[in-house]
Amino acid sequence: MEKLAGYVEHIIYRNTDNGYTVLNLVSGEDEITCVGIFSTIAEGENIEATGDYTDHPTYGTQFKVVSFEEKAPEDQEAIERYLGSGAIKGIGLAMAARIVRRFKEDTFRIIEEEPERLVEVKGISERKAMEIASQVNEKRDLRQAMIFLQQFGITMNLAVKIYNKYGQEVYGILKENPYRLADDIEGVGFRTADDIAAKAGIRTDSDFRVRSGILYTLLQASGEGHTFLPQEELTAKTSELLGIDKDIIEKNYMDLSIDRKIIMKQSGEQTQIYSASFYYMEANTATMLRELDIAYDVADAEIEQRINNIEKQTGMQLDEHQVQAVKEAVRNGLLVITGGPGTGKTTTINTIIRYFEMEGMDIFLAAPTGRAAKRMSETTGFEARTIHRMLELNGGMEGSAGFERNETNPLETDLVIIDEMSMVDITLMNSLLKAIAPGTRLILVGDINQLPSVGPGSVLKDIIQSEALNVVMLTKIFRQASTSDIIVNAHKINRGEEVSLDNKSMDFFFLKRYEADIIINVVLQLVKQKLPKFVDATPYDIQVLTPMRKGLLGVERLNGILQQYLNPPDKSKREKEHGDMVFREGDKVMQTKNNYQLEWEIRTKFGLTVDKGMGIFNGDMGIITEINDFAETMTVEFDEGRKVEYSYKLLDELELAYAITIHKSQGSEYPAVVIPLLSGPSMLMNRNLLYTAVTRARKCVTLVGNDATFNQMIQNTSQQKRYSGLCDRIRESVL
C-alpha cells in the first residue's frame, strides 16, 4: 500500500450516514481524488492517507483510502488555511490571517491553553474567543477519541456514533463495561461488544459479559420465533456461547430479574425465562383481547333476516358454519375465523362487511403485507391496507416500529378485520391492540395450518388453543373450489392423505426428477418458457419456492442461476457487487428485515410525488430500477409503485428473489409457483411446509423432484418447537 500526505482542498461528496467521502487532496504539486470513510475530516485539514490507486470506469484515477491519520497543521500557511476553511465557525479567511499573523506557529497552543489572548486580535471578543477555543478543543477531543476507539478495531463510522453517544465518558465505559454498547448503540450487537471487551481485557466470566450473553441468547431465540426459553435451554445455549460453566450463568439470573431485564415465569415444573419486553407484550396482548371480548344481545331472527337480505342482493349462499361466523361476529366484540383454502373465508368476510355497513358502521380492513392487503381489496371490493399503514407508521426509534395510532390516539372506526393472521407476530399484535379503542369490534381471519409468523410468537395458534375466546372453524370445501386440484390437494396434504401424481390435473403437476442439476434445468424451462404462457403472466410473476436457503436446491444457488437466465449481464445495465451477490438493474429482489425508517415515494411518470410514507418490511418484493455508484445508492420499486432509495450500507437488507424460501412466501399469492424438492432435514421437510407452499399458487402448482420426498413430507407432522406463552397468558387473564 502507498502513503499520501497533503491537505483537503475540497469535499466533493459525503454520505452522512456512513461517512463515505470523495475529496480533493493537494499533495505537493498534485491534486488527487481520494475516496474512503472520512467522517470527521473538514476542508483545510492535513492528513496522511494509506491506500492504493485505482481506475474507476467513470471517474478515472482515484486513491482508495484504507486508513488515514489527521496531522495538525504546523507552518503558518497550513494553520491559516485550516482556520479559514470553515472548519471553525466564526472564522473566515481574513480573521484566520489576522490570528496567524499575531500568534504565528504558536496559534494552536494559544487557542488550547490561553484562549483569552485571542482578544488581542481585532474583531475577537471574549465570548468569541471562548467559542473558538471550544470548537478547537471539541475537534481535538474527537480526534483523540477516534484514535482511542480504533485501537479496538472499531470502524470510523461506528466510532463517531459511540463518541456522539458518550462523549468523554467513552474511555471509562470501554475500560469497565463495553457491553453497554450493545444496549445503547444501534448496529452494535453482543459479538461486536464482546470483541471490544476482549481487546479491553475484560474477564470472560465478568458479570457484565454473562448478563449481556444471556440477553443476547434470548434475542437470538426471538429471531427463531421464541418469546421465551426454558431455563435449562437458556443456560446451555449461553454457556456454549460464552465458553464458561453453567453455574456462573445461573448465578446471574436473579440480578437480571431484579433489574427487570428478564422475567422468570413458572409453568408446572418448567421455569420460563423471557426478555422483559416479550413477557409484557404477551401479558398485555392477553389483557387487551379479553377487554375486547364483549357480548352483544342480538336476536337470532334479526341476524338471519339480515343475512337473507345480503344473500339475495349478492347472490352469495352461506353454509351453516359461515352463518354461525356472521352471528358470532354480530354478538361478540372479538372473533377468530379460521379455515383452509376454498372454505369460504372470503364470502364470510364479505357478508360480515355488508352486515355492519348496513348498520352504518365504519370498517377498516388490513393484512400484514402489501400483497395480502392488495388481495384482500380485490376479493372484498373494499380498501385494505397493511397493518403498519393502518396504524400510521412514523419510523419510531432505530430498529423498532413507532405508530401514530396507539392507546392515546386509537383508530377511529367501529370494526377492524385482519386477514392472514398466521403471519402476525406478538410485537405487531401488541401494537395493533393498543390502537383499538374499547368498544371497537375486532375480527381475526387466518389459516391455522399455515407456517407460523417469521417474527416471535404463535399468535393465531395460541388464541385458538386457549379455548377462551370465540372461534369459528370453516371446514366445508365449496363446489367452485372443489374443481381446483390446488385446493383439493392442499386439504389432502393437510389431512395426511395420498395425493395423485398422475398429472391429469389442469392446475397441479408433479415432474419426477432425481438429480439436482436436472431439476434446475426443468425449473428454468418452466419459469421462462412454459408457465408464463400457461398462466398468462411474465417470468417475474412465476415464483420459485424452495424449503432451504443452502444446498444444491437452496435459495442462494438457485438465485444465482435464475439471475443469469432471466436477467443476464448487459452493457446497458449497471451492477453492484455485494458480498457473494451481484445486484443488477432489472433484478427481482426482496427485503429481508423490517426497516421502519426507510422512506418510499410513489411518483407520476413526470416525477411528481403523489404519495409517500415510511417502512419496508420483511418479504416485500420489488425490482431494481437504478444503481448509482457515485451517490452509492440503489433504487428499488416495490408493489404499487413505491420507490425506495437504498444507500449501499443497507444492501445487507436485500437479496435476490427469483427463488425464495417457502417461509418467506407466507401471506403472498402468485399466478404460478414452482417447487423443487429433493431431500432435506425431517424437522424442516414437513406437512406444514408443503401445505404452505402449495397454497401460495392461484392458477398453477408445479413440483419438480423426488416423489418419495413429497410423500414423506405429507406424512411428517414433526415441527420445530416454538416457545410461546400467549395461550397461558390468555387463560390466566380469564381467572
Outline where the language-model segments fall.
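Conserved helicase motor core of P-loop NTPases
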Residues: 448-614
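Conserved helicase motor core of SF1/SF2 NTP-dependent helicases
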Residues: 351, 355, 359-361, 370-377, ...
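Pre-Walker A segment
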Residues: 266-340, 347
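Loop/turn positions that initiate beta-strands
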Residues: 44-46, 586, 619
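Accessory, non-ATPase domains that flank or precede helicase/AAA+ motor cores in DNA-metabolism machines
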Residues: 1-302
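Conserved RecA-like ASCE P-loop NTPase motor core of nucleic-acid helicases/translocases
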Residues: 335-377, 445, 508-515, 530-551
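C-terminal accessory regions
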Residues: 610-611, 618-735
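The Walker A (P-loop) glycine that initiates the GxxxxGKT/S ATP-binding motif of P-loop NTPases
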Residues: 87, 120, 339, 367, ...
